[in-house]
């Protein structure tokens, strides 16, 4: 158990937050607090020069109630001015400009968009001119890709050789469609990336212990993954339900796309197990804000 002291809304009202890591003996993400904002980073990515990345937490924003306090969604009923201030605070803490963010339009597809200079600010300073985009890739310095979460799986990709990046949102539908592999293939096509040189990461999301699904979902995983992987991905229960491991599924997808095992970072941090620290759709029964994954090129 990891304890941090947090000023939830930067009002001098400090509280102790317990972070439950999934496997205490495994490598963890770094917990960073700057300017009152707490966010997460990967040690492996921190060693790659020329890139910026982060995964937000609930701590350090100005939103209230069920959105407390670092909500990054404009569409869940929070005040727009609070959400904009949250973006500003997070960007300042991590070290990029809010105006450089490009956001996804997540609808559980496997669509991956090539992001260019013209996209700068989409979803933040101007409306998005696209829909149905769950993944993005770019090689434009200064742009920061952003995708959003409250249990689904963030997938990060960095190609330090060609200075290119990818960031994708993978719920169970995106995992069945292997959006992680689609993202890598698009990076190969657009930038000449070699998968063996790409560093990948699976982000904080719902763990297998918390993720119960029905037979119809498992049928799609059986169709998408070879039988020798099934035992690692899910197990059945007497009531006919299953516990599904989206972390392992996306890890296998990254390996299948050609990434090296030693280049893949895992989160060991479950959104549903940490409802005070991270937003979780399941833990909150849908009454929540959104977390954000961010990845950019300096």
Residue ranges and their predicted role:
Residues 2-298:
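Active-site microenvironment for binding and transforming phosphate-containing groups
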């Amino acid at each position: 158990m990891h304890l941090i002291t947090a000023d939830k809304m930067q009002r001098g009202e400090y509280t102790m937050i317990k972070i439950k890591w999934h496997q205490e003996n495994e490598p963890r993400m770094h917990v960073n607090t700057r300017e009152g904002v707490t966010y997460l980073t990967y040690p492996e990515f921190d060693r790659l020069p020329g890139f910026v990345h982060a995964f937000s937490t609930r701590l350090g924003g100005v939103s209230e109630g069920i959105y407390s306090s670092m909500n990054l969604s404009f569409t869940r009923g929070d005040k727009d001015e609070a959400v904009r201030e949250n973006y500003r605070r997070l960007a300042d803490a991590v070290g990029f400009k809010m105006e450089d963010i490009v956001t996804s339009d997540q609808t559980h597809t496997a669509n991956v968009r090539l992001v260019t200079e013209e996209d700068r600010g989409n979803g933040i300073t101007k409306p998005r001119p696209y829909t149905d985009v769950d993944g993005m890739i770019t090689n434009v310095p200064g742009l920061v890709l952003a995708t959003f979460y409250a249990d689904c799986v963030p997938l990060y990709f960095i190609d330090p050789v060609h200075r290119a990046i990818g960031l994708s949102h993978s719920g169970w539908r995106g995992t069945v469609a292997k959006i992680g592999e689609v993202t890598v293939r698009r990076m190969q096509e657009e930038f000449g990336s070699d998968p063996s040189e790409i560093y990948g990461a699976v982000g904080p999301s719902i763990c297998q212990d918390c993720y119960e699904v029905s037979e119809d979902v498992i049928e799609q995983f059986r169709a998408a993954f070879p039988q020798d992987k099934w035992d690692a991905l899910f197990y059945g229960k007497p009531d006919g339900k299953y516990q599904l491991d989206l972390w392992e599924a996306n890890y296998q997808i990254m390996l299948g796309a050609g990434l090296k095992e030693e280049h893949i970072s895992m989160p060991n941090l479950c959104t549903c197990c940490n409802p005070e620290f991270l937003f979780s759709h399941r833990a909150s029964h849908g009454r929540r804000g959104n977390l954000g994954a961010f990845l950019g090129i300096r």
